[in-house]
UniProtKB/Swiss-Prot annotation:
This is Nucleoside triphosphate pyrophosphatase. CDD domains: Maf (cd00555). Its EC number is 3.6.1.9. The lineage of its organism: Bacteria, Pseudomonadati, Campylobacterota, Epsilonproteobacteria, Campylobacterales. Its cofactor is a divalent metal cation. Belongs to the Maf family. It is found in: Cytoplasm.
Length: 183
């Protein structure tokens, strides 16, 4: 059995859809890292920091188990977008994407008793212009919350994607194809 060390609903749904036996263990991570580094390095550091925090608090409970740590960020050029703190920040992030593109970087660390596997994947989504009413509904109903870069591929953004380069599962927060290869 896999231990998903995350409270992410999207990642749990991806594992269920892939028929991977898992148990979800939520943990409140401190994800405050310096964003003045490359997005690729940033997301990897976040995942390693999640592992460190989780194991320092709960290592006795999860010895010799298969643990999965993951994180996703959105970047536009080299600008890192994490989760919006409020509606103002959500509107700012969505304005950067409107009629443009955004890349989702998803990293995971699979810790097994006999090995460690680290993966970094990228999916780029190209968007047509957002409908203003749909955009306002999305933000005002707080649907952007807990979404990296306010991107909701399975919801709001779905109607505005004109091109996808990379796996949908990466955009949703976990490269399932790569993970399955190492389970």
């Amino acid at each position: 059995m896999l231990i998903l060390a995350s409270s992410s609903i999207s990642r749990a749904n991806l594992l269920k859809t892939a028929k991977i036996d898992f148990k979800q263990v939520g943990f409140d991570y401190d994800e405050n890292l310096d964003k003045n580094i490359s997005p690729f390095l940033y997301v990897q550091k976040i995942v390693l920091e999640k592992e460190k925090q989780f194991l320092s608090a709960l290592s006795k409970d999860f010895q010799n188990q298969n643990l999965l740590f993951a994180d996703s960020i959105v970047c536009i050029d080299e600008k890192i977008l994490t989760k919006a703190k409020d509606k103002k920040e959500a509107y700012e992030m969505l304005a950067l994407q409107n009629g443009k593109y955004a890349s989702i970087l998803s990293a995971f660390l699979l810790v097994k008793p006999e090995k460690r596997v680290f993966s970094l994947s990228k999916t780029t989504l190209y968007f047509k212009n957002f409908d203003e009413n749909a955009l306002n509904d999305y933000v005002e109903n707080n649907l952007y919350k807990s979404k990296a870069g306010c991107i909701m591929c399975e919801g709001f953004h779905q109607n505005f994607i004109t091109q996808q380069v990379g796996n949908l599962s990466t955009a949703l927060g976990l490269d399932i194809q790569t993970l399955k290869a190492y389970l």
